[in-house]
Amino acid sequence: MAKGSSQGSRSPSQLIDGRIEELGDWRGQTLSRLRALVKEADPDVVEEWKWRGVPVWYDAGMICTGETYKSVVKVTFAKGAALKDPSGLFNSSLDGNTRRAIDFFEDEKIDEKAFKTLVRAAVTLNKSKA
């Protein structure tokens, strides 16, 4: 993000674009690809910018967040504990009753088909409870 730029005048999608550009490394590339997969899985998805800089995707409720850390890009599914995960993508936040997360590490290949299946399942769950 450019110094002095106002977050208030930028849309959530523009803020996410800025975060991806700001990262400028494998984390930005990974977040960008995961974002594209969410949009492919759910063309009606709405992007938000929450909690001082976390991309969040919604459709009839929160689907997932995209957090970036020094050594991991974490996608947390808000209702992940209620989702079937036959491909075993969930590898983080496994002990809770509600959320589940996937930690993506540098040079890790994304199972795109399985990821999009989880996104679609999360949307279906949200819509069933709406």
Located regions from the model:
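Charge-dense, helix-prone N-terminal extensions
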Residues: 1-130
